[in-house]
Amino acid sequence: MLSHDVNIYKNTVEAKKLNDKKFVVLLDPDKCNNQKLNQVIKLSNDAHVDYFYIGGSLLLHSDLDNFLIRIKEQSNIPTILFPGTTHQISQEADAILYLSMISGRNPDLLIGKHVESAAHIKASGIEVISTGYMLIDGGRPTSVNYISNTLPIPHDKNSIAVSTAIAGELLGLKLIYLEAGSGADVPVSPSMINAVSTHIDIPLIVGGGIRTPEIAKLSAEAGADIIVIGNALEKDPELIIDMSAAIHSVNVKSTSDA
């Protein structure tokens, strides 16, 4: 396990300054048995994946602590909680994305659930990274839409996304996360990614509907600092190798252009 002296957010900010794109594999413990987890960890180690995000909309049956311990036994890749509920917390993680759903108007997901979990999270000692979570229409209803009871930002309304992201930054949030949803028909568009990244100074995460290395690369080139892929890798874990190469190739291109 990483030392808690390692500051994941500080490293993320430094990477943004260097245009060093990061690739995240999203793991849902409810969908990942031991055999598949071992396969994903090995592929992730070989492909130099930057982070694991751990979470899901429900996490009904999983022992989160043991899931994280199994990862730590096989990998030095940092583990970051991506919680769907306030119960998805573990001291075995290296950090947690403290999500505020700023795209919607559900008060529980803006601040209400945070009040319930704040004392426990602070006492856990893990690094907390406040994150402005923005749902973007991915062409079909997703689990996040249903669970959050919120409407996504329309796919083609860049101006709304930009204004929302700026508001999140001005409120002091440390990251902005554009999310099309697990299994989305269409990912967040490169034009929206570019518009948002141009207008904020904090790191930008993009996920949902990224099924191919080509889409992943386009998202990174458009301005995403961190690319999150989950559903596509659940179906074909071997994609990790090509996804990583595509995302990290943007780093090489940026360095050579400089």
PLM segments and residue spans:
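N-terminal amphipathic alpha-helix/helix-capping segment at the start of soluble metabolic enzymes
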Residues: 1-27, 117-130, 137
